[in-house]
């Protein structure tokens, strides 16, 4: 794992994260190295886990008692273990709650080599029927202490292209914060930056009672390129919906982003509480679902739970609004009722997203 030069010394500053590694891995994994580079002011505790699951849980409970981590992150098998470390904020990455079945279905019986070096020098281990039985017993203890407090503490992140573990629905039946990200089973730089780090930042802000300034960004004509949406359709389809193109099924979902919009969104989300706001055409109720899918596809984890629908700008209470001056289904006189700073996207001096980012670069996160 080769993290870009981005580092975030203010995120989880002076705090402690316990990382619980996955099957056949160790505390020297690339994910651990990536976290340490991203969060240089944070102590990352990453013990090598015993192969026997009961021993692994016992070790983790001792580590929690001694280290008292501010956050626990568990990946795959480690996510299954981390779910059982109650009382701590936790992020479970592709958690292998059914690890016994996962090992069997992926031909993991027999001698297995560790992917990363371990402090004890052990290079391999044996997966036999006894170990499978032990995994089944320990994983069966997951979700045993789910209550309202636990539901607020635990996040689940699930790769939408994970070929190994498929536990999103199982997790979501117990915890509400189940989030898809674009990726596979194993972590890489992009997933750490765009999926894991945003959740770490939310948890850190909540712990510090930190409330960043709020930016509302309009979806239509600001993030998504509505004006050129017709280019995705045939002449016959366009003719059938002439004068009401926004009612065309799939219109909003197939829109392209504005140039540099996605990059700008991720950058702003590092410093602000960014919300996506969208109007909806009353004649096309399915547009809400289409816009939700667009946000999930293009903006991902940082936009989770941050999509708002309204046809009246005066209902928005925040610090900044980035929106085209004229957006379908939003009355022009609503604009004057926004109490914060309104950046008229598409007009001087904010004709492009590069212009918008120049404005915010001068503010330093204020």
PLM feature spans:
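Active-site catalytic motif of lipid deacylating hydrolases and related acyltransferases
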Residues: 11-66
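Short, acidic loop-to-helix structural element flanking the phosphoryl-transfer center
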Residues: 242-274, 286
């Amino acid at each position: 794992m080769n993290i870009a030069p981005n580092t975030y010394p203010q995120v989880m500053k002076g705090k402690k994260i316990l990382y619980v590694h996955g099957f056949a891995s160790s505390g020297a994994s690339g994910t651990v190295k990536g976290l340490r580079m991203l969060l240089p002011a944070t102590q990352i505790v990453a013990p090598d886990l015993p192969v026997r699951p009961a021993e692994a849980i016992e070790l983790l409970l001792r580590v929690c008692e001694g280290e008292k981590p501010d956050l626990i992150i568990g990946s795959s098998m480690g996510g299954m273990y981390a779910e059982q470390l109650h009382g701590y904020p936790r992020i479970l990455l592709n958690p292998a709650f059914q690890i016994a079945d996962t090992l069997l279905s992926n031909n993991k019986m027999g001698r297995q080599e560790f992917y990363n070096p371990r402090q004890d020098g052990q290079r391999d281990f044996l997966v036999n029927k006894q170990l499978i039985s032990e995994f089944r017993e320990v994983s069966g203890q997951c979700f045993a202490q789910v209550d309202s407090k636990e539901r607020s503490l635990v996040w689940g992140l699930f790769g939408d292209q994970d070929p190994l573990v498929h536990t999103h629905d199982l997790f979501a039946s117990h915890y509400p914060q189940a989030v898809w990200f674009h990726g596979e089973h194993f972590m890489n730089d992009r997933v750490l930056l765009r999926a894991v780090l945003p959740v770490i930042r939310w948890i850190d802000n909540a712990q510090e009672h930190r409330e960043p300034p709020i930016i509302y960004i309009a979806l239509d004509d600001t993030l998504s390129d509505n004006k050129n949406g017709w280019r995705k359709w045939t002449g016959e389809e366009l003719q059938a919906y002439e004068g009401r193109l926004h009612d065309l099924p799939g219109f909003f979902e197939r829109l392209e982003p504005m140039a540099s919009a996605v990059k700008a969104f991720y950058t702003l989300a590092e410093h602000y509480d960014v919300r996506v706001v969208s109007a909806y055409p009353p004649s096309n109720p399915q547009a809400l679902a289409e816009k939700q899918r667009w946000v999930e596809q293009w903006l991902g984890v940082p936009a989770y739970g941050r999509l708002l629908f309204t046809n009246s700008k005066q209902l928005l209470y925040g610090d900044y609004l980035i929106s085209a001056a004229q957006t379908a289904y939003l009355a022009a006189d609503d604009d004057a009722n926004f109490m914060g700073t309104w950046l008229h996207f598409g007009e001087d001096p904010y004709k492009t997203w590069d212009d918008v980012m120049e404005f915010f670069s001068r503010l330093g996160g204020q």
